[in-house]
Amino acid sequence: AYKDDGAIRFKVPSDRTIEFKDFVRGDMSFETSDVEDFVILRSDNTPTYHLASTVDDIDYGITIIARGEDILSSTPKHILIMEALDAAIPNFCHLPLLFGPDGKKLSKRHGDTSVEAFRQKGILNDAMFNYLCLLGWSPGDDIELFDSDFAISKFDLNKVLPNSATFDEKKLLWLNGQYIRSTSPNKFEEDSLQNIENQLSRELFHEEKDRLLKIFPSVQERIETMNDLFGQVQFLIDEPFIVDKEDWESVTVSYTHLTLPTK
């Protein structure tokens, strides 16, 4: 390493071939002649990603580094740092990136990309987990619906596809609908009543619950998200009778001044 304008650069040897096996992409090799000397410590003494992430992996004893394929070109640098620190070289796995419908890397410009945002849109946790598993991997035998236990038992990094996957929200909605339909009637009723009460910000009346329970079986077969529920059943819910304060006062004043008839 050497100092350059206040920063510290790692001196890359010019006559080496860095080789490693990638679980997704197979045998990889990079010529160090194609890798420039890189900064590991900025002029303000803060470490760069290359140094910080590598030291962190060493410190935690990471044996498999799984990350996006956009970091693949940085792997030779990280291996050189590990060798310089006399650390064991872990296994690597560079996963395909997710793309939007326009063929560009998935980002906020495509709309919602956080799990919490999809949860608020009515996507079930199990459905989201299931769908994300299918982006670049498959358990085989054309199986699309499975729980986390099944996925864990079947998952193998060697079977992850190297090709980038497209995040298809329509497919996610379809999958979410399948999970809703596979929910037990009792669980669906419980979740639905809670969902409606959250929308109303009040508890349902017994009469309303009775009406809703009768229609839930047919609604369960139609909706794709729990957010679709309220629009399907709103006509069965009693609207609260709201009286303007001034009107209420005028009515109460009138009744308090009524004279009871006498014999």
Predicted regions and their residues:
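Generic alpha-helical segment signature
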Residues: A165, S254-Y255
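Catalytic adenosine-cofactor/nucleotide-binding cores of aminoacyl-tRNA synthetases and other
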Residues: D86-N91, L95-I242
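Active-site cores that bind ATP or allylic diphosphates and position pyrophosphate for catalysis
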Residues: A1-L106, S114, P139
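Conserved alpha/beta core segments of nucleic-acid transaction machinery
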Residues: V243-W248
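Post-transcriptional modification and biogenesis factors for structured RNAs
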Residues: S218, V251-S254
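Conserved small/polar residues in nucleotide/adenosyl-binding loops
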Residues: T256-T262
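Charged catalytic carboxylate motif
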Residues: K77, A127, T256
